[in-house]
């Protein structure tokens, strides 16, 4: 497995911080389900960087390619609102701003079967390399799949499982999901928050509702956990509906806990 962009989340109004980031949350879930996971990225020479390396090593990650460089670890400052909702205040890029995988990192990546990335890991130009090498690429486009700034249509052809985030299941959304899948992915998935998710595989659409949670403590990690559950289903050879259900079940468990995994 492979995870890329990582940062520490710090809840500034209650003095709590924890390792997070799309790929990190995803990787921690998979590691806890018995999947071998590696992190290829960078942290700074600071307390956050030390804690990140310690935490990921404790989760069983291979951190041999988690570099340590002069500067600050990437941090997302958040606040806790009404005891539940996390509000993003500021993103501090730190050493991630200039990070690039070196040749050794790139060779290490290609030793793995599944690669997870997003739009912010400074590695979009490597997507064709991974695709040509026959790797399974899982990519989180979040809410930006239709944003012209990110030119996601240029990336879809090199992705196997494309995940996007929207609010409502509309005919226009289905047209977009179908269009995205036709550009290359085996499956394109749109998560819809409390309205569940839809997926398209080139032949038909699939729908999956949510799994009700006993309580809602944190919705920040819902998307990453859904992708992790879906990915584990792919690894286990499950069909698309079962993968979607696995994602929904894991997401339901996560929103009932304080941390995003």
Feature-to-residue mapping (PLM):
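Conserved N-terminal subdomain of the carbohydrate kinase-like
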Residues: 13-14, 35-113
């Amino acid at each position: 497995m492979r995870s890329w962009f990582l940062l520490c989340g710090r809840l500034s109004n209650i003095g709590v911080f924890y390792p997070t980031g799309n790929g990190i949350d995803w990787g921690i879930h998979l590691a806890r389900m018995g999947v071998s996971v590696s992190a290829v990225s960078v942290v700074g020479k600071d307390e956050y960087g030390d804690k990140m390396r310690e935490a990921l090593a404790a989760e069983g990650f291979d951190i041999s390619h988690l570099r340590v460089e002069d500067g600050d670890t990437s941090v997302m400052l958040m606040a806790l609102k009404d005891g539940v909702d996390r509000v993003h205040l500021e993103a501090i890029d730190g050493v991630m701003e200039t990070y690039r995988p070196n040749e050794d990192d790139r060779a290490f990546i290609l030793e793995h079967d599944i690669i997870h990335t997003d739009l912010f890991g400074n590695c979009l130009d490597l997507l064709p390399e991974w695709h040509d090498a026959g790797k399974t690429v899982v990519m989180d486009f979040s809410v930006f799949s239709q944003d012209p700034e990110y030119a996601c249509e240029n990336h879809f052809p090199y992705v196997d499982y494309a995940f996007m985030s929207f609010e409502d299941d509309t005919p226009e959304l289905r047209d977009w999901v179908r269009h995205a899948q036709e550009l290359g992915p085996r499956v394109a998935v749109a998560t819809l928050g409390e309205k569940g998710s839809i997926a398209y595989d080139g032949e038909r659409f699939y729908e999956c509702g949510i799994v009700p949670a006993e309580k809602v403590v944190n919705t920040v990690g819902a998307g990453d956990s859904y992708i992790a559950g879906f990915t584990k289903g792919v690894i286990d050879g499950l069909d698309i509906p079962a993968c979607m259900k696995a994602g929904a079940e894991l997401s339901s468990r996560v929103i009932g806990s304080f941390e995003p995994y």
